[in-house]
């Protein structure tokens, strides 16, 4: 892995400067001859971009949300971030998806990343930052404004970089009992043909005096996908437990980072999607006229 470290570990100052430059450009106006002073409120810059280019029909259009989802692997960040993305009319940017896209490519770096991921290791900061910068630039080119980040930041270094170049409005930290979390991760399945995500685990945890019963029904595929389901290579009990251990060790400081800034919302998932989605909307003071249909 010596080659990997040389490829992926430039100086921290260089990382911050490079990402700051790319991030600022990704949110800045593309008007001819204009430039963005880093001291300017980037939300205002994003709002100016959104005025001329956003095509969202969301009732929340124009508010340019800058939100982050935290939570252990498998907790459901993608599920709820995606729903909020549709509701609020802003893109859902999942760094896990960006990594998987890179893993599907060929080359030395891809093979080294596969080794890290398959052993439950977290991808180094600078690689995630590079992928995210490119995604934000692509979004800027398409006229996107606002975003919901899923899977970033995972370290205080990443959080500091992000804080230095944009104003995150809210950080939603999803929580789930470890017993349920492990079962969810081991039950994840993907359709090898359409790419749909499903979960075959039926979670039913008895309650006691301190905790209520938790029931999470399986998210089963349609009949045409049943025979095409596959598991992720890294969804084994050993790898999942190691991934959770590393995550908890590395992200506790991130939670404290945002808690001190008054931006952290702790949200304990009470059960399956219908119950959890309704409660999350109430916690965020949002309304979804279609929630009964999509839950």
UniProtKB/Swiss-Prot annotation:
The organism's taxonomic lineage, starting at the top: Eukaryota, Viridiplantae, Streptophyta, Embryophyta, Tracheophyta
Keywords of this entry: ATP-binding, Chloroplast, Kinase, Nucleotide-binding, Plastid, Transferase, Transit peptide
Reaction equation(s) it catalyzes: AMP + ATP = 2 ADP
Transit peptide region: 1-46
GO molecular function, one term: ATP binding
One Pfam entry name: ADK
Binding site for ATP: 74-79, 188, 271
Annotated stretches, region: LID: 187-235
CDD domains xref list: ADK (cd01428)
Quaternary structure and partners: Monomer.
E.C. designation(s): 2.7.4.3
Record InterPro entries: Adenyl_kin_sub (IPR006259), Adenylat/UMP-CMP_kin (IPR000850), Adenylat_kinase_CS (IPR033690), P-loop_NTPase (IPR027417)
Residues that bind AMP: 95, 100, 121-123, 151-154, 158, 243
Compartment(s): Plastid, Chloroplast
Annotated protein name in UniProt: Probable adenylate kinase 6, chloroplastic
Any one GO cellular component localisation term in the record: chloroplast
Entry-linked SUPFAM superfamilies: P-loop containing nucleoside triphosphate hydrolases
Superkingdom of the organism of origin: Eukaryota
Coiled-coil annotated spans: none
Family indicated by similarity: Belongs to the adenylate kinase family.
Keyword Protein biosynthesis annotated: no
């Amino acid at each position: 892995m010596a080659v990997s470290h040389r490829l992926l570990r430039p100086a921290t100052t260089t990382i911050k400067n490079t990402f700051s430059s790319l991030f600022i450009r990704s949110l800045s106006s593309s008007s001819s001859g204009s430039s963005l002073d880093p001291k300017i409120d980037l939300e205002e810059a994003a709002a100016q971009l959104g005025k001329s280019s956003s095509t969202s029909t969301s009732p929340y259009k124009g508010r340019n949300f800058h939100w982050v989802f935290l939570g252990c692997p498998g907790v459901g960040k993608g599920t709820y971030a995606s729903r909020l993305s549709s509701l609020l009319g802003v893109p859902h940017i999942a760094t896990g998806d960006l990594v998987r896209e890179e893993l599907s490519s060929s080359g030395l770096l891809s093979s080294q990343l596969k080794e890290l991921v398959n052993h439950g290791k977290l991808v180094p900061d600078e690689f995630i930052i590079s992928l995210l910068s490119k995604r934000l630039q692509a979004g800027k080119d398409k006229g996107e404004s606002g975003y919901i980040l899923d899977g970033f930041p995972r370290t205080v270094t990443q959080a500091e970089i992000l804080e230095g170049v944009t104003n995150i409005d809210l950080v939603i930290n999803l929580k789930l009992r470890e017993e349920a979390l492990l079962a969810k991760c081991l039950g994840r399945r993907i359709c090898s043909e359409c790419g749909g995500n499903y979960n075959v685990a039926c979670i039913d945890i008895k309650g006691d005096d301190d905790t209520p019963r938790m029931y999470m029904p399986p998210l089963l595929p349609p009949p045409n996908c049943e025979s095409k389901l596959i598991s992720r290579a890294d969804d084994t009990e050993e790898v999942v437990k190691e991934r959770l251990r590393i995550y908890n060790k590395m992200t506790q400081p991130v939670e404290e980072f945002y808690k001190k800034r008054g931006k952290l919302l702790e949200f304990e998932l009470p059960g399956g999607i219908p119950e959890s989605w309704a409660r999350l909307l109430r916690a965020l003071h949002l309304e979804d006229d279609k929630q009964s249909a999509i839950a």
